Amino acid sequence: MTMRIDTDKQMNLLSDKNVAIIGGGPVGLTMAKLLQQNGIDVSVYERDNDREARIFGGTLDLHKGSGQEAMKKAGLLQTYYDLALPMGVNIADEKGNILSTKNVKPENRFDNPEINRNDLRAILLNSLENDTVIWDRKLVMLEPGKKKWTLTFENKPSETADLVILANGGMSKVRKFVTDTEVEETGTFNIQADIHQPEINCPGFFQLCNGNRLMASHQGNLLFANPNNNGALHFGISFKTPDEWKNQTQVDFQNRNSVVDFLLKEFSDWDERYKELIHTTLSFVGLATRIFPLEKPWKSKRPLPITMIGDAAHLMPPFAGQGVNSGLVDALILSDNLADGKFNSIEEAVKNYEQQMFIYGKEAQEESTQNEIEMFKPDFTFQQLLNV
C-alpha cells in the first residue's frame, strides 16, 4: 500500500512558525539566508554588539562541492568570488629556505580562494532582510514550553521560537536537549596573532611569504601564516600541549612578554625572520585544540524541535580545512529538508539531516584527526601532506 503525502501540507511545515538561530557566524547566517529564500520566518541571535565587531581569526576558504554549493544555493557564490583571493602556498623549513611552492593555476583560481571573516559576514548580512540579526544577545538559558521554546538572554528581553537551531560554535553551552556529549581536548595547542602593516613591521618574514600563504614545521612545532588578511598578516603556531600544561596553561596570554619568551624558547633554532614575527606581535590568543566527537547518537526524544549545525554540531581540529565547509553543508541539507516538502514533520526533517551529517561529519573529523596525528610527528614536513 502506498501512502500519499500531502504536499501542500509539507510545503507549509514552517509557514506559521518561527525559527531561532543561535549564532551569527557564517554557518548560522547562511542557514538564515537559505530559510528566508523559502519564505520562512527566521531570527538570528548573535552575541557580538553589532555588525562592525571584528572577528578574530584567519581567512576562510570555501571548497567546491561543499561550502561553495551552499553559497551557490544562496545566490552569493559570485559575490564570494569577487572578494575572495586565490592564494598559493610556500613550504619553508626552520632556516627560512623555501622548499617548494604551490601556485594557483588560472583554471583552479575558484577552487578554494581565501576570504576575510568579516568580508564573508558582510556578504551574508547584506543578503538578509532588515533586522533578521538581533545583536548583543548572549543566550544564557533555553527552556521548552508547551508549544514553544523560551530563549533567555543576558540583560535582554526573552524570545520564543518553534524551532531552535544552535549555530553558536564549538563551545556552545546549551546542547543538553540534543546530546550529553562533551567537548574534548585533543592534546595540541594553538597560538594565533595578527600583525598590521606587516610589510613595515616584519618585512623579513613578509618577504619570505612573497604573497603566498606560508607553512613551516620543525620538530613538532608548526607555523601557518597568511600575509594578506585584509591588510594584516595572520599567523598561527601549533604544538603538542606540554605535560605541565595539562591542568593549567603555564603561559599568561594577558602578558605579552610571557608569550614572547615562551615562543622564542620554542623557536630558538629557527631563522631570525621567524623570531622577527614573534617580536613584532603586540598580543596573542591561545587556544587548546578541541573536538566535539560524533561518537554517540544524539537524543531521539527532545521536548520540542531543536538541532545543531556547524562547530556546535561537529567541532574538529583545524588541520584539514573542513570545519566551515562541513557547517555550510549542514545549512544546505537542513534548509532543504525543512522547505522542500519531503517530510511530514519538522522532527523528521531534522532527523534526516542529522543522519546525513553524522556520516560526512565523522569523515571530516577523522581526516582532521589523522592529519593532526601526522603533523605533530618530529619528522613531519608539509610537503608530504600537500604533495608538493
Swiss-Prot record:
Gene3D superfamilies: FAD/NAD(P)-binding domain (3.50.50.60)
pH dependence: Optimum pH is 8.5.
Cofactor(s) this protein requires: FAD
Enzyme class (EC, first level): oxidoreductase
Record annotation: effect of changing K64R: E.coli is more resistant to minocycline (MCN), no change in affinity for MCN, decreased affinity for NADPH, decreased growth rate in E.coli
Co-factor remark: Binds 1 FAD per subunit, which helps bind the antibiotic substrate.
Pfam families: FAD_binding_3
Residues given in the record as substrate binding sites: Q192, R213
Record's keyword annotation contains Hydrolase: no
Keywords, alphabetical: Antibiotic resistance, Cytoplasm, FAD, Flavoprotein, Monooxygenase, NADP, Nucleotide-binding, Oxidoreductase, Transposable element
Effect of S326I: E.coli is more resistant to MCN, no change in affinity for MCN or NADPH, increased growth rate in E.coli
SUPFAM superfamilies with a match to the protein in the record: FAD/NAD(P)-binding domain
Binding site for FAD: P26, V27, Y45, E46, R47, D48, D61, R117, L139, D311, G321, Q322, G323, V324
Example of a GO cellular component annotation carried by this entry: cytoplasm
Residues binding NADPH, per UniProt: R54
Impact upon substituting N371I: E.coli is more resistant to MCN, 2-fold increased affinity for MCN, slightly increased affinity for NADPH, increased growth rate in E.coli
Activity control summary: Anhydrotetracycline, a poor substrate, prevents tetracycline degradation in vitro.
GO biological process terms, semicolon-separated: response to antibiotic
Record InterPro entries: FAD-bd, FAD/NAD-bd_sf, TetX_monooxygenase
Function: An FAD-requiring monooxygenase active on tetracycline antibiotic derivatives, which leads to their inactivation. Hydroxylates carbon 11a of oxytetracycline and tigecycline. Acts on many tetracycline analogs (chlorotetracycline, demeclocycline, doxycycline, minocycline, oxytetracyclinee), probably by monooxygenization. Tigecycline, a new generation tetracycline antibiotic, is rendered less effective against E.coli by this monooxygenation, is much weaker at inhibiting translation in vitro and binds Mg(2+) considerably less well. Expression in E.coli BW25113 reduces its growth rate about 5%.
Summary of subunit composition and partner proteins: Monomer.
Similarity field: Belongs to the aromatic-ring hydroxylase family. TetX subfamily.
Protein's name according to its UniProt entry: Flavin-dependent monooxygenase
Source organism of the structure: Bacteroides thetaiotaomicron
